[in-house]
């Protein structure tokens, strides 16, 4: 069911696609209101239950696993479950919009991601056939209409505001590194085999990047794995996110567009609309 708390109307969906035999993507949407209530997730038989943690907030995450057999699936599953636990603990460190508190909160988010990175590495080493498993991770923690975005890998976060679409995250791929160094053009990078090679990944070599932004009423957030952006252009994303429809309707349309264009990879989409703040008594 959609999330309609924490100041958001949010919905997520995932699909194996039309080519792959295993879905290695995962997503998670949670409200944090003195406890974490998992509203919707693709995780199977999750034992997360209710995790204590004060504060009113929302947590959105997507992950795209990498590895042979079912290792990628396990990596993305482990990452989301463990990050959810660590972020719950992190929320205790941040209650108000205070610069010093915010810096501590951001550092705690980085720590949560790096602890998860170590967990995935250890899980891979402990189970034959899962050595070297890794995953992307993109999360958005919304607290009091401020968004904290943490990214490892190339799963993206977009902001749609007043008709404009902005990519908040930077793809952590070899191709993007070459673009940043002036060695390759952005157009060439889109079709380069290096665009599929991660320069940072949970379980591999993780270098989490953190972005912060203030949110406005009717802003739209989009998190997705590359199974969406391989098939749906920025023009199409802008058109869909500009719709007044619910997050659920927009999410399902985007996923179907990727499938209709070929569905060459697993596809995972999370869409969230920022709601009008409640009237204070």
Regions flagged by a language model, labelled:
Residues 1-281:
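PP2C/PPM-type serine/threonine phosphatase catalytic domain
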């Amino acid at each position: 069911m959609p999330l309609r708390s924490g100041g958001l109307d949010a919905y997520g969906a995932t699909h194996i696609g039309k080519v792959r035999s295993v879905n290695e993507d995962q997503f998670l949407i949670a409200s944090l209101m003195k406890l974490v209530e998992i509203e919707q997730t693709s995780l199977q038989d999750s034992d997360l239950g209710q995790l204590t943690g004060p504060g009113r907030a929302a947590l959105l995450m997507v992950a795209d696993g990498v590895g042979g057999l079912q290792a990628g699936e396990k990596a993305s599953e482990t990452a989301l479950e463990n990050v959810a636990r660590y972020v719950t603990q992190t929320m205790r460190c941040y209650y108000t919009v205070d610069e010093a508190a915010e810096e501590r909160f951001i550092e705690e988010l980085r720590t949560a991601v790096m602890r998860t990175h170590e967990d995935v590495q250890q899980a891979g080493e402990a189970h034959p056939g899962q050595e070297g498993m890794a995953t992307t991770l993109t999360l958005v923690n919304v607290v009091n209409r401020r968004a904290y975005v943490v990214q490892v890998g190339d799963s993206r976060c977009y902001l749609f505001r007043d008709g404009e679409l902005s990519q908040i995250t930077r793809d952590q791929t070899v191709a993007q590194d070459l673009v940043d160094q002036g060695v390759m053009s952005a157009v060439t990078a889109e079709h380069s085999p290096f665009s599929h090679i991660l320069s940072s990944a949970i379980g591999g070599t993780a270098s989490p990047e953190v972005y912060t932004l203030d949110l406005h009423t009717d802003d739209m957030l989009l998190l997705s794995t590359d199974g969406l952006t391989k098939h749906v252009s920025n023009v199409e994303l802008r058109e869909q996110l500009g719709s007044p429809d619910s997050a659920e309707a927009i999410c399902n349309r985007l996923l179907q567009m990727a499938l209709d264009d070929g569905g060459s990879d697993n596809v995972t989409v999370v869409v969230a609309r920022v709601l009008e703040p409640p009237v204070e008594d």
